């Protein structure tokens, strides 16, 4: 297979590329990535010498560059390219509209023109909004995005569906719960808490910390993407989840326990505007139709994740250089504190 991956220098994209090259020996991958703040070439440095892997720096909104890339001929595209952090979308919604909506449409148009055999679009559970206690969203749930980020991803999903229905683009949408694992940018909850705890810095927790998220180890998600790529049904949406939502506070306490750090490091800060209370997905469709199920328990996954960050301090230091500290101070250091753990 000749595979185009957009946004492959980010967290899930880089893990996916590594997973495919390790498990699909006959696959060639071109990674097309703009290398924004969260796109880290260090995440794929060990693959630079692999003849099956190629990298081109570029913007999915650059229609000429995208058209030129498509001339190489691909069997499929997996689109990870996106702005993904909710806090940043609250500050700058226009960037999310430009990248996540306009950029996706640009890729869809190129795929239509090239008659691409397969287009897999990576979406998010956040398009559904906040799930009531005891309920789980199915693929038929009406979308109800609550943040600019979620709205941009929901809009992109609608464009993917529209191109499939109107132009016959062979597209599939994947909506997954929160991922965690190696190479995740430290603005996200789990790597942020690991990094701060290791340095005995305060661990900022939004509101009461009881927001529930369903955490899936990134390796399990990569397997789901490969299955969808190879066996998924065109035009379908597949939810992907571990099926066991946990409060953020429980996650933070688990990290502190693994690191042998006190809960007094926890610091409760003013909650995010419009913060969804709970995400939960029903993933029975992909389990039933494609035979997927998670293989890594949260206990194993969080241990592997913590060990990876502790063993890769140089990668973490690189990720936290540049504008990261300014962002961190704006969102956490200068955010009003409610009380400490």
Language model regions located:
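Residue-level signature of the cytosolic catalytic core of signaling kinases
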Residues: 40, 49, 133, 182-186, ...
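Residues that form or flank phosphate/diphosphate-binding pockets in enzymes
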Residues: 12, 38-39, 64, 184, ...
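N-terminal Rossmann-like NAD(P)+-binding domain of SDR-like oxidoreductases, especially those catalyzing
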Residues: 1-179, 304, 309-312, 318-341
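The catalytic Tyr-centered alpha-helix of NAD(P)H-dependent dehydrogenases
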Residues: 145-152, 176, 182, 186, ...
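Hydrophobic alpha-helix immediately C-terminal to the catalytic Tyr-X-X-X-Lys motif of short-chain
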Residues: 155, 159, 163, 193, ...
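Proline-centered turn/helix-capping motifs that create local helix->coil transitions or kinks
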Residues: 120, 129-133, 168, 184, ...
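Short aromatic-enriched loop/helix-cap "lid" or pocket-rim segments at secondary-structure transitions
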Residues: 41-44, 131-134, 184-187, 251-252, ...
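C-terminal substrate-binding subdomain of Rossmann-fold SDR/epimerase-dehydratase oxidoreductases
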Residues: 4, 16, 58, 191, ...
């Amino acid at each position: 297979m000749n595979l185009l991956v957009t946004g492959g220098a980010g967290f899930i994209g880089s893990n996916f590329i590594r997973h495919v090259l390790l498990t699909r020996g006959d696959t060639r991958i071109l990674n097309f990535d703009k290398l924004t703040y969260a796109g880290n070439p260090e995440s794929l440095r060990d693959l630079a010498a692999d003849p099956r892997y190629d990298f081109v720096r570029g913007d999915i909104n650059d229609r000429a560059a995208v058209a030129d890339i498509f001339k190489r001929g691909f069997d499929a595209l997996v689109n990870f390219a996106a702005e993904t952090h909710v806090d940043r979308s609250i500050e700058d919604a226009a960037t999310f509209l430009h990248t996540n909506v306009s950029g996706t449409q640009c890729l869809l148009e190129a795929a239509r023109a090239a008659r691409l055999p397969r287009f897999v679009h990576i979406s998010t559970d956040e398009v559904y909004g906040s799930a009531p206690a005891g309920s789980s969203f199915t693929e038929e749930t009406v979308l109800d995005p609550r943040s600019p980020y979620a709205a941009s991803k929901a809009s992109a999903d609608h464009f993917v569906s529209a191109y499939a229905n109107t132009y016959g683009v062979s597209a599939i949408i994947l909506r997954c719960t929160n991922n965690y694992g190696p190479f995740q940018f430290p603005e996200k909850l789990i790597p942020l808490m690991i990094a701060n705890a290791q340095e005995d810095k305060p661990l900022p927790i939004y509101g009461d910390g009881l927001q529930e998220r369903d955490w899936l180890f990134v390796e399990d998600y990569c397997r789901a993407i490969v299955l969808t790529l190879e066996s998924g049904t065109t035009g379908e949406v597949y939810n992907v989840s571990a099926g066991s939502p946990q409060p953020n506070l429980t996650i933070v306490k688990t990290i502190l326990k693994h690191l042998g750090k006190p809960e007094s490091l926890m610091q409760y800060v003013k909650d995010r505007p419009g913060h969804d209370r709970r995400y939960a997905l029903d993933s029975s469709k992909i389990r039933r139709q494609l035979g997927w199920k998670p293989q890594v328990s949260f206990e194993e996954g969080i241990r592997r994740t913590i060990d990876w960050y502790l063993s890769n301090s140089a990668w973490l230091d690189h990720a936290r250089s540049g504008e990261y500290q300014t962002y961190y101070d704006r969102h956490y250091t200068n955010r009003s504190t409610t009380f400490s753990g």
